[in-house]
Structure formats: structure tokens, C-alpha cells
Amino acid sequence: MARLLWLLRGLTLGTAPRRAVRGQAGGGGPGTGPGLGEAGSLATCELPLAKSEWQKKLTPEQFYVTREKGTEPPFSGIYLNNKEAGMYHCVCCDSPLFSSEKKYCSGTGWPSFSEAHGTSGSDESHTGILRRLDTSLGSARTEVVCKQCEAHLGHVFPDGPGPNGQRFCINSVALKFKPRKH
């Protein structure tokens, strides 16, 4: 209760409340601590956007994929053949999701990664992603969403390269690439 009061004390009348999130885009990322970024500062994010606000912020294709759980056509994504070193962020909230070091060519038509950024062994608690059961096509698959804004990113399959055997099949349109600074 004390923490909630501390969070609310800076609000003035007419100010929309902000909610604490774990990590911050470009910092330690989601999962770095209980509402704290790397430097220990409280990271905040606006309340979840309404559908109309997402439609204003995103292109129609980005909205369809990230907010309506769509899929871009295979072999059409801008990042499919990207070989530049850097980080792939969520197009909706800028949370770091996947490193180019874990990207590989799976031949499936979508950018593929062997693990999410921040994975330690099989521990994904410090990554920017969440896994969810998806039964939308009549069979069970594992959906991958952004931990910070719940954007649909793609799916993960158990047919990837070793040692963990995972293939994160991610829509390019759900990503924003930031090249590594030299």
C-alpha cells in the first residue's frame, strides 16, 4: 500500500495514472526487477492504449499483426534477410526482444531466432517476451507476445537449432531494428 501511495503522490488532478512496468525500453528490459530499471529508477508506461490509439500509432499492417494476432505473408518481411548486427525491439513499445546474434535462416519465410534477448539457459524471466497457449487454428501452438505491451510477435516451435531446439518465428512488421553502434 505504501508503494502505491508513493507512486500516486506525484499525480495532479486530471493526470492519467501511470502504471509501473518491469524494466524500460533500451535499459535492463522487462524482468530486471520489481518495477525497476537498471539504474534502480522506476520505469513507467502509460496505461494500455485503446484500440483507436493503437490504430493511430501503427500502420494498418502493424496493427493487424500486433494487436489482432495476424501474420504477415511469408518471405515479405523487411528483416527476413537482415544480417546487420544489432537488436530487434517491439514496434509498439520499443522493448528489446531479440539480438541479431541469435538470428538464423530457418527457410520458413519469417525472421527466426534461437532465443529471446536476456535468456539465461532455459530461464526467460529476464526477457521481453511471454509465451501463451494459442489454439486459434484448431491445434495447440505457443504464441510469443511482448511482455511490456502484449503485442503479438509470432510463435515459437520446437524445431530450431541446438542446444535448446527452439525456433522463434517472428513477424518483421512487429519489430523495429536498431543497429549496433560501433
Curated annotation (Swiss-Prot):
The chain's coiled-coil residues are none
Q: What is its EC number?
A: 1.8.4.12, 1.8.4.14
Pfam families attached here?
Answer: SelR (PF01641)
Indicate where this protein is primarily found: mitochondrion
GO BP: any one term:
response to oxidative stress
Which residues constitute the catalytic centre?
A: C169 (nucleophile)
Q: Transit peptide extent?
A: 1-20
Please provide the record's keywords in A-Z order. Metal-binding, Mitochondrion, Oxidoreductase, Transit peptide, Zinc
Q: Name one GO molecular function term.
A: peptide-methionine (R)-S-oxide reductase activity
Cofactor, free-text remark: Binds 1 zinc ion per subunit.
The reactions it catalyses are: L-methionyl-[protein] + [thioredoxin]-disulfide + H2O = L-methionyl-(R)-S-oxide-[protein] + [thioredoxin]-dithiol; [thioredoxin]-disulfide + L-methionine + H2O = L-methionine (R)-S-oxide + [thioredoxin]-dithiol
MsrB domain sequence ranges: 51-180
- Tissues expressed in: Ubiquitous. Detected in retina, ocular ciliary body, skeletal muscle, heart, colon, bone marrow, cerebellum, small intestine, fetal brain, fetal liver, kidney, spinal cord, lung, placenta and prostate.
Cofactor(s) in the UniProt record: Zn(2+)
GO CC term, one of those recorded: mitochondrion
Q: Which InterPro entries match?
A: Met_Sox_Rdtase_MsrB, Met_Sox_Rdtase_MsrB_dom, Mss4-like_sf
**Family from the record:** Belongs to the MsrB Met sulfoxide reductase family.
State whether it acts alone or in a complex, and with which partners, per the record.
Answer: Interacts with DAOA; the interaction is direct.
Q: What is this protein called?
A: Methionine-R-sulfoxide reductase B2, mitochondrial
Gene designation per UniProt:
MSRB2
